[in-house]
């Protein structure tokens, strides 16, 4: 109960700290802090509440997993905080709990994130424990086996979830020989092969200062943060030694692949190549995706759900990964209506490419993308996450204050041009899991009517 109470106090303080730091209509005052050894972080300094949140991003992720050890980055993220230095797994977790410190790691496809949140009074301990986790992880066999078992249980569960399976199969189809086509958590076989030495090698190779991005929010001065940066990160390797990941265009050939599964609904995943982050057209593409599938008033939701009742929900988004930009969407409908749903998606893709958006759609989409932006900053860790993410994308500290202008600059003619570029109906590639009527199992037809 004491631990739960302390955790509640920390969470409340983090949220209150946010409300006094940033809110819609107010500018972000971001400081760029550089340590004596040259490590850089972005800081929003706020002494109104005694809390600090830090997020760090390393240039490493599941895409860097060895071909026979898929799931390595994920297992590493799940075991880095399971004991470090002289502290066993139990002792390490107990120390975190006693000081109300939140410390954990997450492995994405291209990113490896670390997150720490702490009360100011316990921040010396928090940063030292972060340092230990990064530099002296124990990877005790018992702890690794326990976390491995949890991950394998999740893998088994995911294989029984039609939505997860359909997404995985779609990615395999578009990236048959690329890391993006592999499951991020790995397979039962690959996770079973990973040992503590594999974890140590990946940590040493991938957790480096190269590409390191750090965001910090809260009750800490720039001077103290500079010292903390060197304390925690200065002794990491200067360069990553992970093998590079190749850029790859998705093989989106406009075909439909049907995988038989005896379920009442057909789960549909669709998409093709997209527009990369950093492309001058990116925010224009984001506006168009908002119009097509961004909410209840979007074209796909209106056509698929509201007018025809074919599905409860349908969505599509830009997925600008580091080495391949994609558009990915999904829905689920009755097997008898899968063909109709596919044709509606194709028709909406074709309509946007040929006609572009209307003036009212553009106005509404701009209003939403600009107005919703501050809502992502739900607490201090969320702000720290955004600061690290913006930095990692190569944006400047003024990005939060310039973003609205970056969106508003797109004209109707710009968006019509981008629509012709983005919405490639002929390349729209589908994976359908289920028993859709009028689309044969194993079908690779160019159209659902064939």
Task: Cite the ranges covered by each PLM segment.
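His/Glu-based metal-binding/catalytic segments typifying zinc-dependent metallopeptidases
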Residues: 46, 55-57, 241-297
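Short, solvent-exposed loop/turn elements at domain surfaces
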Residues: 42-43, 50-53, 63-66, 440
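N-terminal signal peptide c-region/cleavage motif recognized by signal peptidases
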Residues: 22-24
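Bacterial N-terminal signal peptides that target proteins for export
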Residues: 2-13
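N- or domain-start disorder-to-order transition segments that initiate the globular core
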Residues: 26-50
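M16/MPP (pitrilysin/insulinase) zinc-metallopeptidase core fold and M16-derived inactive scaffolds
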Residues: 30, 55-120, 183, 295-310
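Small-molecule pocket liners
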Residues: 52-56, 212, 265-268, 327, ...
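Charge-rich, well-structured scaffold segments of protease-associated domains
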Residues: 34, 91-241, 258, 276, ...
């Amino acid at each position: 109960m004491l631990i739960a109470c302390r955790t509640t106090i920390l969470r409340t303080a983090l949220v209150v700290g946010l409300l006094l730091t940033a809110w819609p209509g107010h500018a972000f005052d971001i400081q760029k802090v550089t340590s004596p050894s040259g490590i850089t972080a972005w800081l929003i300094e706020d002494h109104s509440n005694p809390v600090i949140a830090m997020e760090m991003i390393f240039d490493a992720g599941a895409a860097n997993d060895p071909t026979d050890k898929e799931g390595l980055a994920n297992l590493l993220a799940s075991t880095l905080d399971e004991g470090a230095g002289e502290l066993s797994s139990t002792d390490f977790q107990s120390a975190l709990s006693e000081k109300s410190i939140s410390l954990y790691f997450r492995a994405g496809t291209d990113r490896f994130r670390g997150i720490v949140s702490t009360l100011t009074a316990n921040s010396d301990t928090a940063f030292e424990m972060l340092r230990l986790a990064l530099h002296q992880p124990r990877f005790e066999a018992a702890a690794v086996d326990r976390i491995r078992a949890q991950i394998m249980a999740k893998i088994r569960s995911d294989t029984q979830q039609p939505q997860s399976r359909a997404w995985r199969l779609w990615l395999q189809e578009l990236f048959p020989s690329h890391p993006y086509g592999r499951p991020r958590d790995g397979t039962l076989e690959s996770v079973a092969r990973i040992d503590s030495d594999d974890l140590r090698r990946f940590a040493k190779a991938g957790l480096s200062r190269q590409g390191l991005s750090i965001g910090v929010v809260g009750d800490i001065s720039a001077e103290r943060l500079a010292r903390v940066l060197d304390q925690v990160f200065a002794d990491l390797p200067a360069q990553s030694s992970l093998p590079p990941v190749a850029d790859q265009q998705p093989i989106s050939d406009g075909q439909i692949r049907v995988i038989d599964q005896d379920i009442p609904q057909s789960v549909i995943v669709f998409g093709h190549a997209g527009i990369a982050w950093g492309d001058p057209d990116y925010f224009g593409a984001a506006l168009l995706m908002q119009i097509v599938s961004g909410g209840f008033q979007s074209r796909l939701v209106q056509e698929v759900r509201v007018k025809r009742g074919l599905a409860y929900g349908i969505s599509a988004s830009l997925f600008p990964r580091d080495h391949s930009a994609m558009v990915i969407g999904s829905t689920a409908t009755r097997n008898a209506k899968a063909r109709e749903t596919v044709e509606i998606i194709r028709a909406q893709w074709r309509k946007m490419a040929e006609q572009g958006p209307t003036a009212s759609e553009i106005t509404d989409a701009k209003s939403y993308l600009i107005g919703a932006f501050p809502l992502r900053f739900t607490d201090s860790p969320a702000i720290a996450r955004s600061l690290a993410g913006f930095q990692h994308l190569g944006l400047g500290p003024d990005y939060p204050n310039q973003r609205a202008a970056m969106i508003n600059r797109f004209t109707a003619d710009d968006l019509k041009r981008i629509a012709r570029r983005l919405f490639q109906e002929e390349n729209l590639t589908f994976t359908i899991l289920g028993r859709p009527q009028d689309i044969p199992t194993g079908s690779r037809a160019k159209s659902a009517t064939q």
